Amino acid sequence: MNAVTESAATTAEMPVPFVFTDAAADKVKQLIDEEGNPDLKLRVFVQGGGCSGFQYGFTFDEEVNEDDTVMNKNGVQLLIDSMSYQYLVGAEIDYKDDLNGAQFVIKNPNASTTCGCGSSFSV
């Protein structure tokens, strides 16, 4: 497990490889509170599929795997597995609630193209 914090205070911690916004962390905290299970963590992953080749996925998980990178923000944990990590380095994980609806959004500088809905991409 790799621990990541917004400000790396010790040499054992890695620099921040992605941004987990306050809006996203606060929404995750709200959803976890609604579930009533404080052991839940948000897992963000990349898998094959979608109209552009890869797609993002979000799920709640109670387990932290050995190869996960863990980011702590506002009292919640974000998990990214080692395969997905390479596609998400430099990305911003945000939560938007506007006229287009409410959803988690990933702004990924590694994506060369994205589909219209923003849930799939290619590199």
From Swiss-Prot:
The keyword Isomerase does not apply. Pfam families: Fe-S_biosyn. Binds 1 iron-sulfur cluster per subunit. It comes from the Bacteria. InterPro entries: FeS_biogenesis (IPR000361), FeS_cluster_insertion (IPR016092), FeS_cluster_insertion_CS (IPR017870), FeS_cluster_insertion_RrpA (IPR023063), HesB-like_dom_sf (IPR035903). Its cofactor is iron-sulfur cluster. GO terms for biological process: iron-sulfur cluster assembly. Iron-sulfur cluster binds at residues 51, 115, 117. Coiled coil: none annotated. Keywords: Iron, Iron-sulfur, Metal-binding. One of its GO terms (molecular function) is 2 iron, 2 sulfur cluster binding. PROSITE patterns: HESB. NCBIfam families: iron-sulfur cluster assembly accessory protein, PRK13623.1. Required for insertion of 4Fe-4S clusters. Belongs to the HesB/IscA family. Homodimer. This is Putative iron-sulfur cluster insertion protein ErpA.
